[in-house]
Amino acid sequence: MGEEKAFDWWARMRKGGVKVAKGWTEAYYTDFSRAEGGASPLVVSYASSPAAELFYSKEKLTQPPTGSLSLPGAVYKQIEGVALVKGGQARPAAEKFIEFMRSAEVQKQMQTEMWMYPVEPGVALADAMKFAPEPAKADTPSDQDIADKGAAWVARWTQVVLK
């Protein structure tokens, strides 16, 4: 999409009445129209949210009540991980913990507990994850771009969307 087009898009969203909530919980469970009384028909969430909606639904649903849009330039890959800390005092225990986190059992369970895709190849997807197709392309800036431009992007986004 490019930097300028992204900020133009956000400016148009502001003119269209975009609301920025305090956090994900408020956006999803209060403002989103799927929630009781919410007025916003769209919410920024995770690609796995439709699968979680189906998994936790009280009704017997065969399809999720929400969908996921994988728009060009609008998918940011969120990475969560576990690693050794330089100078850590319990390296053997930390290595065992990492091994545990990478185990097939944990990788399978994380899919319907944390709604994450497995990191280890060969781990089968949970049935619910068929409703959470992994986005084909994420437009994640490089670490260097984030280091060089991140603060300016946040300041500009705040000015464009919130001020």
Where are each of the predicted segments found?
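Ligand-binding pocket segment of bilobal, Venus flytrap-like solute-binding proteins
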Residues: 2-74
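Short coil/loop linkers at secondary-structure junctions
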Residues: 4, 19, 116-117, 132, ...
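Extracytoplasmic/secreted proteins, especially bacterial periplasmic and envelope-associated proteins
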Residues: 5-8, 23, 27, 31, ...
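Sec-exported extracytoplasmic/periplasmic mature domains
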Residues: 14-18, 33-37, 55, 89, ...
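Extracytoplasmic/periplasmic, Sec-exported soluble proteins
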Residues: 20, 24, 76, 85-90, ...
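Internal helical hairpin/lid segments
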Residues: 46, 64-95
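Mature extracytoplasmic/periplasmic domains
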Residues: 80-141
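Extracellular/periplasmic bilobal clamshell ligand-binding domains
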Residues: 127-163
